[in-house]
């Protein structure tokens, strides 16, 4: 995945209003034509990073999806100034993205391990993922025993230790079902789907 791109600034806001420019110390939102930043969605926190222009630097503290599908980069103008129409260099924090991706992958390992230990009735009902932690909500009909928790933990840790490559492929929904791919909670799928595999997980 790309971590940098150049794009034109199309909209700037402070916390109260749409503006033509942001100056050092201003808190606000930057909207550009195209971005490499992932927005907060599906329980996963959005990217952090910086947006640079020839005259200033904006620290992105979170990234959100706005009405109409645009992406908002929320943060603080930390140096100089920037204005609508400027060309900006978008830079995602590589460490933040990598750690978030690792925890996102861990939710998939956890789901498979839970289904292996508890049964196929286990389904994801929600999750939260950021670089430091994850939470995974799932269906089950009783509290897990200490032994079940230990088994699930062992399976996930074994798979992490194996350093299994993550392989992605795009295929039709029918082809995905034939491979045994699991659909995720709350997702709506089009004709083509992205399938992620980690070994036999």
Walk through the language-model features, giving the residues of each:
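A glycine- and charged-residue-rich anion-binding loop/surface
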Residues: 1-201
């Amino acid at each position: 995945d790309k971590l940098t791109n150049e794009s034109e600034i199309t909209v700037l806001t402070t916390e109260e209003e749409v503006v033509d420019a942001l100056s050092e110390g201003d808190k606000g939102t930057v909207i550009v034509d195209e971005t490499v930043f992932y927005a907060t969605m599906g329980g996963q926190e959005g990217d952090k990073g910086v947006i640079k222009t020839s005259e200033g630097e904006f620290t992105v503290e979170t990234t959100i999806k706005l009405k109409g599908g645009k992406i908002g980069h929320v943060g603080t103008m930390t140096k100089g100034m920037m204005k609508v129409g400027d060309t900006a260099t978008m830079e995602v924090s590589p460490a933040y993205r990598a750690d978030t991706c690792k925890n996102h992958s861990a939710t998939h390992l956890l789901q498979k391990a839970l289904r292996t230990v508890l049964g196929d009735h286990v389904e994801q009902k929600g999750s939260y993922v950021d670089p430091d932690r994850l939470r995974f909500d799932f269906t089950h009909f009783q509290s897990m025993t200490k032994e079940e928790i230990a088994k699930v933990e062992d399976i996930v840790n074994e798979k992490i230790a194996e350093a299994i490559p993550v392989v992605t492929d795009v295929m039709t929904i029918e082809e995905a079902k034939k491979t045994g791919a699991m659909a995720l909670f709350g997702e709506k799928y089009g004709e083509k789907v992205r399938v992620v595999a980690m070994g036999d997980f």
